[in-house]
Amino acid sequence: MSNVIEFYKQDFSSTLFPLNTNLILIENHLEELNKYVYEKILNSEMTEHSFLSQQKVYATKPKNHLRRTIKLDPIAEFFIYDVIYRNRTKFRGAVSEERKCFGFKFKDGEAIKLHEAYANFKSDLNSLKEEFSYYLKFDIASYFNSLYHHDVCHWFTSKQVGETDSIFFGQFCREINSGRSVDFMPHGIYPSKMIGNEFLKYIDLNHELKSSKIIRFMDDFILFDNDQNVLKKDFIKIQKLLGSKGLNINPAKTSLNSEYQEVSSTLSTVKQALMAVIPTDGLNNLVSGVEVSDQQHSEQTALALSEVQIEQLLNLLKDNQIEEEDADLILSFLKNYSDNLLIVLAEILKKFPNLIKQVYSVSLRITDKELLANVLLEHLESEHLFLEYELFWLGKLVEDCLLDVSLIGKLLMKIYELSNSYKIAQAKILEIPINNFGLKEIRLDFLKTGQSDWLAWSSAIGLRGLAVAERNYNLDYFSKASPINFLIASCVKKL
């Protein structure tokens, strides 16, 4: 990996809200972004420039729970990738063989891929289960939302980064959240994952912990020993260590292996039926932030299914008693048989909005695009309660594989209308360079108001398909509203 652009591009599709507005600027306007950030925003003598307070967004979690985070604008997103990339050597590997963490760092010049890190974690986990009689598993409740700005900044300084980078990072953390000290860390981007993983090394380094082995995948801890009392004492100690940083354990995800096995022994009828069709051992105990697709990739799972198996899996997807984790697993098994999913896709979209990214992945492989478009439009016109994350990924699905279908105008405008309360989902539609169906007029309205927000920025990016003279004329007025507007306009003009 030669530079920050490659780092950003490698991570782009894995993020929660990948907007092309940011990608286009970082790919095509890096030098200008760099100058603005380091010569103006981070120049103590130019106090009129600063990082903007960032847009709150909500990704989904199972059972209608929401994951609150922020979507960084192009300038802020460039900075966090740049500062972490330049300081990537400060992020080290495991403390020792007895205290191991996995992934979220660079190795041989490349950011370690999630599925590779998880494969190593899973390999150690399986070996240690055989070696020790007991293990205790737990994770941190709302980890990224609970991180305290000053704790993270002090930690970053302690990594012996340059004094200026330490100051710059502190300014970034403070300004993107309007000075609020918690709930500032962006979710779902690799630099944040590197920070979150490395920050917890103070637990790994604590010599008061006596468990024979401790392994950690981000904030998911597993302690191993042949003595339950050792595990319990360490568990109490770790809670106190985490408490010193305002962090708490999630009680619902805390289990001792014997308790876990007891719960696992009483499986739902759907789960039992699934296991009768496909061996699923080990594919349902995910740690935080690891999707089934990553886990399957880590285990190089590639099953050739018979027609009978495909039909059985589709019938399970239709079962009203199916749990989300089982539906997720079945979708991953059927990823190479995506055309078969069209008959159940509407039901999946309705019951499991949290699976929209998995639906996006499998839908890309569907060959009958017109039928897929009809299914999506019918869903969009239903009484379903649409969430921001769902609408965003439906917009991305339309952009990435349905631009040539006959229903493209209806799909785009319906997603845009349903996203009325969701700026980032609307921005997804506005940045698509299609100028029919009223989208051009909507964009021009945003550009003429003098506003400087996601609706205006994505509208400017969406103009890149216009004739040069008309495009540049409209961008000239937009560019005068703010420095970020000017940067975006100057980037689009040279595309």
PLM features per residue range, with description:
Residues M1-W155, Q160-E163, R174-I189:
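Conserved two-metal-ion catalytic palm core of "right-hand" nucleic acid polymerases
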Residues I112-M218, I222-K232, K245, P279-L495:
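Conserved polymerase palm-domain catalytic core
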Residues G188, S192, K245-V277:
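Conserved catalytic core of two-metal-ion nucleotidyltransferases
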Residues Y85-T89, L205, K240:
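Short, intrinsically disordered, mixed-charge
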Residues G93-E98, I214, N248-I249:
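Short, polar/charged, Gly/Pro-enriched helix-capping and turn/loop motifs at alpha-helix termini
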